Swiss-Prot record:
It is found in: Cytoplasm; Nucleus. It comes from Aspergillus giganteus. Belongs to the pacC/RIM101 family. It comes from the Eukaryota. Keywords: Activator, Cytoplasm, DNA-binding, Metal-binding, Nucleus, Repeat, Repressor, Transcription, Transcription regulation, Zinc, Zinc-finger. This is pH-response transcription factor pacC/RIM101. Activated by C-terminal proteolytic cleavage by signaling protease (probably palB/RIM13) at neutral to alkaline ambient pH. The lineage of its organism: Eukaryota, Fungi, Dikarya, Ascomycota, Pezizomycotina. The gene is pacC. A motif (YPX[LI] motif 1) lies at residues 462-465. Residues 1-51, 381-547, 621-678 are annotated as: Disordered.
Amino acid sequence: MSEHQDNNNNNTAATAASPSSTVAPVPTPVPQEQLSSQLPAPAAPAPVSAATPVPSVTATAAAATAAVASPPMNGSPRPSEELSCLWQGCSEKCSSAEALYEHICERHVGRKSTNNLNLTCQWGSCRTTTVKRDHITSHIRVHVPLKPHKCEFCGKAFKRPQDLKKHVKTHADDSVLVRSPEPGSRNPDMMFPGGGKGYAAAAHYFEPSLNPVPSQAYGHGAPQYYQAHPPPQPANPSYGNVYYALNHGHDGHASYESKKRGYDALNEFFGDLKRRQFDLHSYAAVGQRLLGLQNLSLPILAGGPLPEYQPMPAPVAVGGGYSPGGHGPPVYHLPPMSNVRTKNDLLNIDQFLQQMQETIYENDDHVAAAGVAQPGAHYVHGGMSYRTTHSPPSQLPPSHATATTSAATMMSHPATHSPSTGTPALTPPSSAQSYTSGRSPISMSSAHRVSPPHHDGGSGMYPRLPSATMADSMTAGYPTTSSAAPPSTLGGIFDDDRRRYTGGTLQRARPEERRLSVDMDIRQDGKEVGDRTPTGKEAGSQSASPVRISANLIDPALHSNSSSDAESALRTAQAATEVAERTDSQWVEKVRLLEYLRNYIASRLDRGEYDADARRALARHSPEMRHDGHMEGVETSHTLTKPEEPAASPAIRSLSDDSVMYPTLRGLGGDEDTKMHS
């Protein structure tokens, strides 16, 4: 009995010892290293007692750690699984997806250099044919479970780069999408430590642990969020390091180039004005020269009106950028204009620009459109002398109806267009009166605006009409630069309404001449005549004669023989309208540009932006300011008269002249000449 119990105890001990030796092998040190690299180290390792059965637990944990620490890379299966090649006639088995891919490319696709290139896929039932080896090797990735291209946002792997590119578009949120950095470049605040691990797309904006690289774009350093006492920052801090596609450098350089181009063109234009290189009295010459200044970035007036075609640069103020208390944006200064350096140059150029304005406003077409030289205006005052041009007289006779004028203030509106955009100025239809409504080419100093006439004698000539819209905002010079000078009567502003007809003549339609070829039908209806169908000519004459209407009584717009005539007339009218609109727009641009140039010159004169040294130099060399060789308060050069020296002999003079190799240096206080000899 005791022997049987001893045998049972021995078997039980052997059974208990066998699992520890076979089932739970001693773990190798490699899984422990992987475990320490992947999982955070515990605070204090617990001591392992020798009495507890540790080997089985340790083996289970090591196996789980090895499975987690070594996942299938690039989507390939575990090494224990074998992948079979399904190419036609091949039964090769590979241990990994990379090996299978290399096997297919080298064994079945081949190369042109080895004379075994195959461009037809024979994987299973696939018979895709390509034209290049690169194409078929890219196609083979569809059959092989190889996914080397991983998304850095969500960690999903793809077989081909084009599949990854399509997948990235699903993350296309403008606020969080960050493109992958180019090779060799470092994008601050957008770097993932350890490659894409499947973090959220917007997590890297606010977690300091994911921003190991300090910010390089702004001056406030790396963001420190969720802290009790943040470090001091300059004014207007940002709400996170967010990159905006502002492109300050490129836009600033382009803006500087465009402004410099306009600055140089304006300087050249002023030089041409000073040299009178084009006729100021020719509308065509003035328009051609002004064409070169349009659509350019001209200097911005300080506190004055801006041309409508010049966009105003908008300042950019975002968090972390330029703040009012910090460094401002880069400022550049253009060199002064060489052709407008003195005050005299500015005054002369202002006179030339005034003459150009007179030429623009006195253009025959636009003066006729304004009602100055219309055919119906037969009234000519006896006091007016005959003028060869259509321009208005510079002085009005005292008996003519005039308007009381008053000085107007400068307009501070940023645009220099007409205050009455759609409503023309309502003035009596007089050639002289229409040019006293603020449109005459007057100087900047003698600006006037229209007020209702206040006189007793001439008020009965014309009815009292309402004043122009926004008359108080009309500025000096040429404030209303609408399209062509609008008609001065109550008519519209379209070309069809500008037609003037001479009245006082009664007219009627021209009587139509009787057609002698049409004979009266005197035939009698009867069987003796014969029943026959009348010819087309006879039927047409019979049907047209009783209902025919005189062509002179039909509206010309309705009287057309065919539709082609109406279409051609419509096309002609449309073309004429387009030409008129284009001409009017060009005229408006010329007027606006001249107004801007005159405001620019006036602003420089008001601020004193001219060279004062030239004025002092002119005063220094003027003869009336000299008195006894110098003037008090003006610097004079040291041109002291030197006492005459005794004449040297010709031999000494010739020797001294031959030996001097440098110009003579004269002392300021001495009378002797210092000569430098070789």
